[in-house]
């Protein structure tokens, strides 16, 4: 989602692969996977971001998600 990152592509891809493997291991359908990932994002924001910044972070995350979907739609 982000255009630039302090994390290597390899590190991001490794984490993504491991998370996909967990979802596949549990045969999670798309709606369950999205529910779990959404709950994970909510938990990360609520436990790792200062209360005053949570709404801004959530909005920024949502905008980045929407932008990445639009970008993927244009590619297809």
Curated annotation (Swiss-Prot):
InterPro entries in the record: UPF0352, YejL_sf
Record-annotated membrane-spanning stretches: none
Gene3D superfamilies: YejL-like (1.10.3390.10)
Pfam families: DUF1414
Family listed: Belongs to the UPF0352 family.
UniProt xrefs under NCBIfam families: PRK13689.1
The protein's name in its UniProt record: UPF0352 protein PC1_1633
Organism: Pectobacterium carotovorum subsp. carotovorum (strain PC1)
């Amino acid at each position: 989602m982000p255009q630039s990152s302090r994390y290597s592509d390899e590190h991001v891809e490794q984490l993504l692969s491991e998370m996909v493997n967990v979802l596949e291991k549990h045969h999670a359908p798309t709606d369950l996977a999205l529910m779990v990932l959404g709950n994970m994002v909510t938990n990360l924001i609520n436990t790792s971001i200062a209360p005053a910044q949570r709404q801004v972070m959530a909005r920024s995350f949502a905008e980045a998600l929407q932008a990445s979907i639009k970008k993927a739609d244009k590619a297809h």
